[in-house]
Amino acid sequence: MASVKDRRVESPATDTDLGRGVFEFSDRYSVFDWGEMPDHVPGKGASLCTMGAYTFEQLAAAGVPTHYQGVRTPDGETVRLADAPEAPTQMVIDLTQVPTLPFEDGSYDYDRYHDAGGSNYLVPLEVVFRNAVPVGSSLRTRCAPADVGIDADEWPQGPVELPETIVEFSTKYEEQDRYLSRSMADEIAGDADIAELDALARRVNETITDCAADAGFVHDDGKLECVYVDGEVRVADVAGTFDENRFRFDGREVSKEAVRQFYKRSDPEWVGAVKDAKRAADERGVADWKSLCEPSPDPLPPEILQAAADLYAAGANRYTAREWFDAPPLGDALDAFE
């Protein structure tokens, strides 16, 4: 489960105090939980850092607690996004404890995770909020339309709006994402309260949805991570980016989902092998599903790689209402994926 960003510790967290760290955003990307893909998308790291910082500052204005402290400039200062001289690639954050999640005898040991984390830890869940069901949503494989209030026997081919926002919980540190019942999520969350995580996710969703609307986007869904500190849950990791959220512009996908869908069309052998390997790993009770997947992904064609770079850059310009990047109109970048 390789990340697209690196975490640098400047002062470590302890049982009683938060630390200080820096996210260094790279141009790496990952689809289908593969980890680092063959290509790097030029400028992607700066795009994600810029959008994430913008979102965190909007959340702060709305009174939502987060771990964000600012962005790091080339000369080492920590400033608000508006004061950054160029699109940043480093984000300064409060650090909490992130214990190792043990895997033994075919299962994960969350009791040991929480014993190590105490009352200051990263909640080992992803909190997912859904306003709509786009083409690539896992909800389409896990639920019938009627289960989520949609009056249809089968899922429509295009995105479909939900009658009300849905909040779900999935595992964070397992080799495969696993959606959970509320009771199981509550158990895995430790001292963090599921109702508070749900409420926090809805506040984050509202803020990102408003930011998206101001930029001419439709916000379909997203995910967030949270820290639990001194009895309070706060937004962690990064939020409101094209990797954590799915948006639409003029009815077309504006997120990492565009690359996922390209791979489904252009490299179905690898996509199918990933699915089969995950299923086999579940059946065998092993964590490392990639060792069961023989094919590797093909590199992106040069024109698609450039289109992905343009998507991230042009989309970040639009979302933040500032021309950070020299990029073509967003619609032109999206044309290449069709």
Curated annotation (Swiss-Prot):
Disulfide bonds: none
Annotated family: Belongs to the SAICAR synthetase family. Highly divergent.
UniProt key word Cell membrane: no
GO molecular function: ATP binding; phosphoribosylaminoimidazolesuccinocarboxamide synthase activity
Keyword terms: ATP-binding, Ligase, Nucleotide-binding, Purine biosynthesis
HAMAP family the UniProt entry points to: SAICAR_synth
Name of this chain's protein: Putative phosphoribosylaminoimidazole-succinocarboxamide synthase
Pathway as given in its UniProt record: Purine metabolism; IMP biosynthesis via de novo pathway; 5-amino-1-(5-phospho-D-ribosyl)imidazole-4-carboxamide from 5-amino-1-(5-phospho-D-ribosyl)imidazole-4-carboxylate: step 1/2
Signal sequence bounds: none
GO biological process: 'de novo' IMP biosynthetic process
Broad class of enzyme this protein falls into: ligase
